Amino acid sequence: MRRGFKQYKLLGFLSVCLLLGACAEHQESMANNDPSKYRLAKDVLWASPNGLDLTMDIYTPTTGAATYPVVVMFHGGGWLINDNSIMDQSAAYLATHANYVVCNVNYRLLSDHGNSVNLNEIVNDAFGAVLWVKDNIADYKGDRTRVAVTGDSAGAHLSAMVVNMGDRLSSD
């Protein structure tokens, strides 16, 4: 019985080492995103609820295709902290290595407007960002009929909420 535990312990240790090595390699490759392989439209204003300007950074691949599929990306931070800059490397990676137009979105935080923003407003921001993308992404060579959403942590929650509200998106 004791011997089996040692084998699992060793296997677990080796698995963690392998995973950490893969993560380090992925981080290095993300840090080497070639800026000549995408065009960046920084701080594109997409809404101004209650006077707070909401922006997104739009990364467009430069491979010469007529249009590209689109990924709308929401950052994490517990709806309280951070902005889209924490997703810059991931956005550039998707644009350069997967040929997506990436919309890296800022949304209101719970701490904005003297802590008066609520979670429903943040969810509406996320949904509004996707609606804006569908209406405007052709200006950035994005295909409005091929839009996906993703996010990290709180951003993943917002992505799930957008998907759940999908029946409110137009069918095209």
Model segments located where?
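A fold-wide structural signal in alpha/beta-hydrolase
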Residues: 70, 99-106
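Primarily recognizes the serine-hydrolase "nucleophile elbow" in alpha/beta-hydrolase
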Residues: 128-172
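Short beta-strand element of the alpha/beta-hydrolase
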Residues: 67-76
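N-terminal cap/lid segment of alpha/beta-hydrolase-fold proteins
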Residues: 27-66
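C-terminal motif of bacterial Sec signal peptides marking the signal peptidase cleavage site
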Residues: 19-22
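Catalytic nucleophile-loop/oxyanion-hole region of alpha/beta-hydrolase
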Residues: 47, 83-84, 90, 103-144
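Bacterial N-terminal signal peptides that target proteins for export
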Residues: 2-12
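N-terminal carbohydrate-binding/catalytic regions of secreted carbohydrate-active enzymes
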Residues: 57-60, 67, 81-93
